[in-house]
Curated annotation (Swiss-Prot):
Gene3D superfamilies: Nitrogenase molybdenum iron protein domain
Domain of life: Eukaryota
InterPro entries listed in its UniProt record: LIPOR_BchN/ChlN, Nase/OxRdtase_comp1, Protochl_reductN
Note on cofactor: Binds 1 [4Fe-4S] cluster per heterodimer. The cluster is bound at the heterodimer interface by residues from both subunits.
One BP annotation, GO: light-independent chlorophyll biosynthetic process
Quaternary assembly: Protochlorophyllide reductase is composed of three subunits; ChlL, ChlN and ChlB. Forms a heterotetramer of two ChlB and two ChlN subunits.
Subcellular location(s) per record: Plastid, Chloroplast
Gene giving rise to this polypeptide: chlN
Cofactor needs: [4Fe-4S] cluster
Family recorded in the similarity comment: Belongs to the BchN/ChlN family.
High-level lineage: Eukaryota, Viridiplantae, Streptophyta, Embryophyta, Anthocerotophyta
Organism this protein belongs to: Anthoceros angustus
Protein name: Light-independent protochlorophyllide reductase subunit N
GO CC entries: chloroplast
Described function: Component of the dark-operative protochlorophyllide reductase (DPOR) that uses Mg-ATP and reduced ferredoxin to reduce ring D of protochlorophyllide (Pchlide) to form chlorophyllide a (Chlide). This reaction is light-independent. The NB-protein (ChlN-ChlB) is the catalytic component of the complex.
Length: 471
């Protein structure tokens, strides 16, 4: 009996509500990434409670973020918003002296029409500290889009690339080559290697990653003779990369479509549409795409990928043949599904709150090719999924694992479906060759837990009524 496998991806769109964290949660990782910044969230008590509980850091501990709490006087326009924000920002400058203050707008600032963009330039002149305004409110599709909003706002603050300066650098490099006789042999080799790496247009990568992961990706590109000119965001606001005509940019996360649009339209950069460096297959495709744009032939990438797959053998034996269902939460679903299919899993459905098909075109193409290579059915992709309909489909399909938001995890577990919180993939280190193990560690944890319970014989839930004797 022959099984016919669909050759194309199926896209559907339902009319469900968005079930996700508030995008102001981006403060959790961005304030740690941009070390000389201060985030001021302008919202209500609800926003403060969310930040305090979700981030696990007490506001009273004075981290590098704070709440500007709106009161009844602000909402009824009895107070002067500008004067109140001015007082707070001067206090922040006195206490913390940041290089940049980032205002995070919320739902309330949208509803009462606070003109944050109008107030920021005026206050910036008085304060002497740059103020970046980002509207990371709950009107977005997914909580990860908070980072997208902040990076899009910061892209406007990146310095303009000066072609004259770049030409002067070339002249200086040529002068250095002319006086090589003054250098040692080791110094000559280092300088030649540097000049060789710079023999391509500037490359800026955008997306917030831990410093160790960003260094790993930069090193992987350096092995292919590609030098990364800068990252957006940087660890220090004062080190933002230069942008402009002739600068190539490439994203590392699938939820940064707004930033990509800003870089293309406003800063005139050239976007490299590549799959995202999640999993060994995605990382290899990401490097190959960047190399092909610069006309550089890759070397040793296939062997590097095979080494990683070899090191994951124990995990692959556990997940091979298992099925997974993505309910949709953080916009990482397409990349994770592609990687898990490559690991031998069957993906029934990819629920995703929203997808920019232009920005994720390369990722979708790689997903399609991976399904053909692994001879597995093409998963259905459902935008804005309705959770009620999803539950009905899961009852029929009975997947081995459901990757879902925190709100649905316990109800699904009670119905006998293994779950994994999708938010964990957001905070885990999942990019690059070396972090593929962490992805599979998260995916296999529920499966390994169940295997351990079966070994103990704990397979049935037994309810026993104890009769209490009254003496």
């Amino acid at each position: 009996m022959s099984i016919q496998i669909s050759e194309t991806l199926t896209f559907e769109c339902e009319t469900g509500n968005y079930h996700t964290f508030c995008p102001i949660s981006c403060v959790a990782w961005l304030y740690q990434k941009i070390e000389d910044s201060f985030f001021l969230v302008i919202g209500t008590k609800t926003c403060g409670y969310f930040l305090q509980n979700a981030l696990g850091v007490m506001i009273f501990a004075e981290p590098r973020y704070a709440m500007a709490e709106l009161e009844e006087g602000d909402i009824s326009a009895q107070l002067n918003d500008y004067e109140e924000l001015k007082r707070l920002c001067f206090q922040i400058k006195k206490d913390r002296n940041p290089s940049v203050i980032i205002w995070i707008g919320t739902c309330t600032t949208e509803i009462i029409k606070m003109d944050l963009e109008g107030m920021a330039p005026k206050l910036e002149v008085e304060l002497g500290v740059p103020i970046v305004v980002a509207r990371a409110n709950g009107l977005d599709y997914a909580f990860t889009q908070g980072e997208d909003t902040v990076l899009a706002a910061m892209a406007h603050r990146c310095p303009e690339r000066d072609l004259l300066i770049d030409e002067n650098k070339v002249i200086q490099n040529q002068t250095i080559q002319n006086i090589f006789s003054l250098f040692s042999q080791k110094k000559k080799e280092e300088t030649l290697k540097y000049l060789e790496l710079k023999n391509h247009p500037p490359l800026v990568l955008f997306g917030s990653l831990p410093s160790t992961v960003a260094s790993q990706l930069s090193l992987e590109l350096k092995r292919q003779s590609i030098q990364v000119s800068g990252w957006l965001p940087t660890q220090r606001y004062t080190d933002l990369p230069s942008l402009g005509d002739g600068v190539y940019v490439c994203g590392v996360n699938p939820f940064l479509s707004r930033t990509a649009t800003t870089l293309i339209r406003r800063r005139k950069c050239k976007l490299i549409g590549a799959p995202f460096p999640i999993g060994p297959d995605g990382t290899r495709a990401w490097i190959e795409k960047i190399s092909s744009v610069f006309g550089i032939k890759t070397k040793g990438l296939e062997e590097r990928e095979q080494q990683v797959w070899q090191s994951l053998k124990n995990y692959l034996n556990l997940v091979r043949g298992k099925s997974v269902f993505f309910m949709g939460d953080n916009l990482l679903e397409i990349s994770l599904a592609r990687f898990l299919i490559r690991c031998g899993m069957i993906v029934y459905e990819i629920g995703i709150p929203y997808m920019d098909k232009r920005y994720q075109a390369a990722e979708l193409a790689l997903l399609r090719n991976t399904c053909r290579e692994m001879c597995t059915p093409m998963p259905r992709i459902v935008e804005k999924p309705d959770n009620y309909n999803q539950i009905q489909r899961m009852r029929e399909l009975q997947p081995d694992l459901a990757i879902t938001g925190m709100a649905h995890a316990n109800p699904l577990e009670a119905r006998g479906i293994n779950t994994k919180w999708s938010v964990e993939f957001t905070f885990a280190q999942i990019h690059g060759f070396t972090n593929a193990k962490d992805v599979l560690e998260l995916v296999t944890r529920p499966l390994r837990r169940n295997n351990s319970l079966e070994d103990l014989g704990w397979t049935n839930l037994i309810k026993k009524d104890n009769k209490i004797k009254v003496i």
